[in-house]
Regions:
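Catalytic domains that recognize anionic headgroups
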Residues: 1-242
């Protein structure tokens, strides 16, 4: 959709061609890691005004007070206290604190799935339970987090190392192993496109608006012989653009 030479977003490109999707072209994330971005996304806090998320309302709570059912399907967080992953704990104590979560969500999923399509089956089950016509549904996908090869099922593998040019757009010469990593990332993007397409299919006959925010970017052997990103709050705008 944004000029990448390989077909990583066939579903969303199809929606755009049909005039059903309107891509934003000038959007900057407030952070390049999930927790900080979600602090600002779910609240009325502002990066520009340097306000804290906990000093403003969280928008799902406003929907609840307005009479909406608010359903949350999260595939990045486990809901057991035994998980000691620091990022998992930050999200869990932010959105899923026992005192806060009931004010935000009518329903949260109890299970985490190997792949994001598991959330769709969970949604289908809950869709039969909640009949309120006024509903806010949030999907928090695992997306394209490392390790990329773990973010799509084997049958969704579309690209191989042979699909990836030897030289990156910056002129970096990539080994075959590095091109395989890029192919894994591209496959994760393409699988994510499939999941988002299935969400759109479920909303097609409803009076609904779908807003999709893509995963934070990753440097995948573009400018250096490495992949991933720096978890740093002090970032330039260019470093956060998709």
């Amino acid at each position: 959709m944004y000029g990448y030479p390989l077909p990583t977003t066939p579903r969303l490109s199809q929606e755009e061609a049909a005039g059903r999707l309107y891509p934003f072209t000038d959007v900057v994330s407030p952070a390049n890691f999930t927790v900080k971005a979600m602090h600002l996304l779910f609240s009325f806090a502002s990066q520009d005004r340097q306000t804290a998320w906990c000093d403003t309302p969280l928008f799902p709570a406003l929907f609840r007070r307005a009479g909406y059912d608010t359903l949350m399907f999260d595939n990045q967080t486990t809901f057991t206290l035994e998980n000691d992953d620091v990022w998992d704990q930050e999200i869990r104590h932010f959105l899923y604190h026992p005192r806060l979560s009931p004010q935000l969500f009518t329903h949260c999923n109890a299970d985490k799935y190997p792949f994001d399509e598991g959330l769709l089956a969970d949604f289908d089950r809950q869709d039969l339970r909640f009949r309120n016509p006024h509903r806010l549904t949030i999907f928090h996908l695992m997306g394209q987090h490392v390790a990329y090869r773990n973010r799509f099922p084997a049958e969704a593998g579309y690209f191989t190392a042979d699909s990836i040019p030897e030289y990156s757009t910056s002129g970096l010469r990539r080994s075959r192993d590095e091109r395989r990593i890029v192919a894994d990332y591209d496959n994760a993007v393409r699988y994510n496109d499939r999941v988002v397409g299935e969400i759109l299919d479920r909303c097609r006959t409803r009076d609904a608006v779908v807003v999709y925010l893509s995963d934070h970017g990753e440097g995948v052997v573009d400018y250096a012989h490495r992949n991933g990103r720096v978890h740093d709050a002090a970032l330039s705008a260019d470093g956060c653009r998709p």
